[in-house]
A protein has these predicted regions:
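Acidic, Mg2+-coordinating catalytic modules of nucleic-acid enzymes
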Residues: 105-111, 124, 203, 446-464, ...
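Short linear interaction motifs
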Residues: 96-98, 174-203
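A general structural signal for short secondary-structure junctions and capping/turn motifs
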Residues: 72-79, 104-107, 116, 197-206, ...
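Short, polar loop/linker segments at the starts of domains and inter-domain junctions
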Residues: 19-21, 99-101, 221-237, 427-431
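Flexible phosphate/Mg2+-sensing switch loops adjacent to catalytic phosphate-binding sites
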Residues: 50-80, 184-194, 292, 367, ...
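Conserved P-loop NTP-binding catalytic core
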Residues: 43-110, 255-264
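Switch/communication elements of ASCE P-loop NTPase nucleotide-binding domains
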Residues: 1-51, 266, 270-280, 293-299, ...
Length: 502
């Protein structure tokens, strides 16, 4: 119902000048060198509406505002703006709003913007506009006096609404149904626009989930780490917590249990579901499976006791930790190793699926996936598997990922690519794939070069063109002709950009 359409980063870390980035409805790829600002884009976006309460994903003026300009805003009373997000609202959602507030009440367009600022993490919403007269008509209140209408239109809080009821006691019975539209406090222009956003729109607003290599599952997990809810977990333990949550394991019950078989069975059931997905897209080795074991770590303590024969020393054995051990077994070689001792690529893929399954379990929210350098340790063929997996998600999720790997760029979908590079003053993001910086373009050039080599060997009919723009023009024109029942390029012809004479 709501899709992210555009973001404009105003001030964030290496972004010192505003950068507008168009977001695709399915997958958007940020390509650039290390330290170009790719990760900053994902971080800044995640902090606008993160899926859980995490201090790491809240705007921090000291840590996030461009360092060179920090002094200039330190004495200012107003909080600087960080990012503007533009969302597209579907006609279906507008229909739901009008079903609740009255036909024709929505006066805005199909876009709303959310501006996030530093400091109190406040958000300015624009684009929500409700026709007040039609709203009153929907509630059969069109005939109330003009003075009452004026007071209502200016009322923003429930307290002010109560004052109106006291001022117009004869209208109390008719106006009382309006109470549910008011809030305790509000900074909106009208109470009904606040209601439209907070009750009808906000719950459909997608949340962001960020994932990078630091979220990979550890091989050994100390279960006592999860007993204190007030302790901030490290990124890898957050993924471990997601695994336990998916398995519906109560850590307190596990720690106090004498036998762990039931808990291991729950973990194995969850692992089986995740592995079913994993091996659909993991073609490197189909002989791997995950094993779980729960160990008790004990310690001995000596103490003095008094007996009828005098003082004596006794030794107590106490359980100090419960450890969940995660291992990967190769059914072909019959060798098992700790998870972190297997390939980093396999660990990344499995850990990501654990993290991803956590949000899939929440059917009440929509998500946008932010993946920082996904599959960095994957082999080229495994990266192709990862791309297939990401493609399978686009019906339900928008995906934005960063990369500098040529194997994570689909040459047939270059419209998804945004180049990120840094000049002397600011990080810059561009829709153009013809930047002059060769280092920024290297993944694209390498991907196209690989595609050319593959096509020349595999495809029987190749149409050689000068550059990428020619490929895009011809492909677009051909698709347009086909859509209008005219003749486009034959499907067995592969367009191959050669890079020109330069």
């Amino acid at each position: 119902m709501i899709k992210l359409k555009n973001i404009e980063i105003l001030k964030y870390k290496s972004f010192t000048t505003p950068q507008s980035i168009n977001i695709e409805e399915d997958i958007t790829v940020l390509v650039g060198m290390n330290e170009s600002g790719k990760t900053s884009v994902l971080e800044c976006l995640a902090k606008t509406n993160y899926f859980e309460d995490d201090e790491k994903f809240k705007f921090n003026e000291t840590l996030d505002y461009p360092r060179k300009e920090l002094k200039s805003i330190s004495k200012s009373d107003s909080k600087p703006k960080a990012i503007i997000c533009t969302y597209h609202i579907s006609d279906e959602l507008i229909g739901l709003i009008e079903n609740r507030l009255g036909k024709g009440t929505w006066q805005g367009s199909n876009e709303i913007t959310l501006t996030s600022s530093y400091g109190d993490s406040s958000t300015l919403i624009s684009g929500v506009s409700i026709n007040f007269e039609l709203f009153l008509k929907h509630l059969n209140l069109s005939d109330i006096g003009d003075d009452v209408k004026t007071e209502l239109k200016l009322a923003l809080t429930e307290e002010k609404f109560d004052q109106i009821l006291k001022k117009f006691p004869d209208e109390t019975e008719r106006l009382e149904p309006l109470r549910k539209y008011f809030f305790k406090s509000s900074t909106w222009m009208t109470f009904i626009e606040r209601y439209a956003y907070s009750v009808l729109i906000k719950r459909h607003l997608p949340k962001f989930i960020y994932y990078d290599e630091y979220y990979q599952l550890p091989s050994r997990i100390i279960l006592e780490s999860f007993l204190d809810d007030d302790v901030d977990l490290s990124d890898d333990l957050k993924t471990a917590k997601a695994l336990l949550d998916l398995s519906e394991i109560n850590v307190n019950e596990l720690i106090n249990a004498d036998d762990f078989e039931d808990f291991i069975a729950e973990l194995e059931a969850t692992e089986a579901l995740i592995s079913d997905t994993l091996f659909q897209y993991w073609s490197a080795n189909q002989n791997l499976n995950i094993e779980f074991k729960i160990d008790k770590k004990t310690a001995t303590v000596k103490r003095q006791v008094n007996t009828s024969y005098g003082s004596a020393t006794t030794v107590d054995t106490n359980i100090v930790e419960h450890v969940l051990d995660i291992r990967v077994k190769n059914s072909k070689t019959r060798v098992s190793l700790p998870l972190q001792n297997r390939s980093k690529g396999f660990n990344w893929f499995f850990s990501f699926l654990v993290w991803f399954n956590k949000i899939q379990a929440d059917s009440n929210s929509k998500y946008i996936l932010l993946l920082d350098e996904p599959g960095l340790n994957l082999h080229a063929t495994a990266q192709a598997d990862l791309l297939r997996f990401l493609e399978s998600l686009v019906d339900k999720y928008q995906v934005i990922y960063t990369t500098h790997s040529p194997f994570m760029v689909e040459t047939t979908k270059l419209n998804r690519v945004r180049t990120v590079f840094s000049d002397s003053d600011s990080s810059i993001v561009s829709d153009s794939i013809q930047q002059k910086d060769p280092n920024t373009l290297f993944p694209l050039q390498a991907a196209l070069g690989y595609d050319v080599a593959q096509n020349l060997f595999i495809s029987k009919k190749n149409l050689l063109v000068e550059g990428v723009s020619d490929l895009l023009y011809l492909t677009t024109i051909s698709e347009y002709l086909n859509a209008n029942k005219r003749t486009g390029l034959n499907e067995d012809i592969t367009i191959v950009p050669t890079g020109g004479a330069e």
